[in-house]
Amino acid sequence: MIFPCLFQSMLNLYAEALSTFSLLFEEAKSSSEIEPDAMMLATASLEGHPSVRTVLLKKFDARGFVFYSHIDSPKGRDLQANPQAALLFLWRSLREAGVQVRIEGRVQQVLAEEADAYFASRPRQSQIGAWASMQSCPLGSPEEFQARLAEVKATFEGRDVPRPEGWVGFRVAPRVLEFWYGARFRLHERWRYEVDAAGYWRKFLLYP
C-alpha cells in the first residue's frame, strides 16, 4: 500500500530532479561553457546497433527534453524503429571538477503546431538550410550544397519559409535522471532518480 503522503513525496522527486537540472543548466549558461545546451544523444536501431551524436536542447519541461532534426536522418530512423534514447550533458567548468547529467527515456514526436512555432522562430538562413539539406546523405561537393541553398532561397524569396514536412521535434520523456558531481581523487557524488514499473519515482545516492 502506498500512503498518500509517500505518493506525493514520490511525485515531488520528479519535480526535484527537474528543478536540479534547471538550476545546473542556468549555472552552465552563466559559466564559460561554449554551448551549455549541447547534449549527446544516443540511439539504437531495431537490430541494436548504437550510434551517438551531439544535438542541441531546445526546450524542457515536465513532459521532457526537446530537440529537432530530420525524420529521415539516421537518428530519426532509429527513433521511429526504437523510440528509446539517452542524453548526456557534460559541463566541465561547473563545481569542483565538472557536472554530468544523464537522462534516459522514451521518445515521441512533438505536435506539428509546436514544431511549426519553433521553426518560425529560427533565423531565416537556418530555415533555408533545413530545406536544402538532405541530412546525412552523400554530397558531391560543397558547391552542390551552396547551389541547393541558392535554389531554396530563390524559391521562398519574399515570403515566409514553412517548416519542411520531415523536419520534426523529438521529446525524450525521462524515466531516469542521474546527476554526477565531479570531485578530486575520483570521490564523486552521484544522485539517481528513476521511475519504477508502477510509475513511482525513487531517489538513490550511488557509489562513484
UniProtKB/Swiss-Prot annotation:
Binds 1 FMN per subunit. Gene3D superfamilies: Electron Transport, Fmn-binding Protein, Chain A. Its EC number is 1.4.3.5. It catalyses: pyridoxamine 5'-phosphate + O2 + H2O = pyridoxal 5'-phosphate + H2O2 + NH4(+); pyridoxine 5'-phosphate + O2 = pyridoxal 5'-phosphate + H2O2. It comes from the Bacteria. One of its GO terms (molecular function) is pyridoxamine phosphate oxidase activity. FMN binds at residues 53-58, 68-69, 75, 100, 135-136, 180, 190. It is an enzyme of class 1 (oxidoreductase). The keyword Signal does not apply. Its cofactor is FMN. Pathway: Cofactor metabolism; pyridoxal 5'-phosphate salvage; pyridoxal 5'-phosphate from pyridoxamine 5'-phosphate: step 1/1; Cofactor metabolism; pyridoxal 5'-phosphate salvage; pyridoxal 5'-phosphate from pyridoxine 5'-phosphate: step 1/1. GO terms for biological process: pyridoxine biosynthetic process. Signal peptide: none annotated. Keywords: Flavoprotein, FMN, Oxidoreductase, Pyridoxine biosynthesis. Substrate binds at residues 58, 118, 122, 126, 186-188. Homodimer. Catalyzes the oxidation of either pyridoxine 5'-phosphate (PNP) or pyridoxamine 5'-phosphate (PMP) into pyridoxal 5'-phosphate (PLP). Belongs to the pyridoxamine 5'-phosphate oxidase family. This is Pyridoxine/pyridoxamine 5'-phosphate oxidase. It comes from Xylella fastidiosa (strain 9a5c).
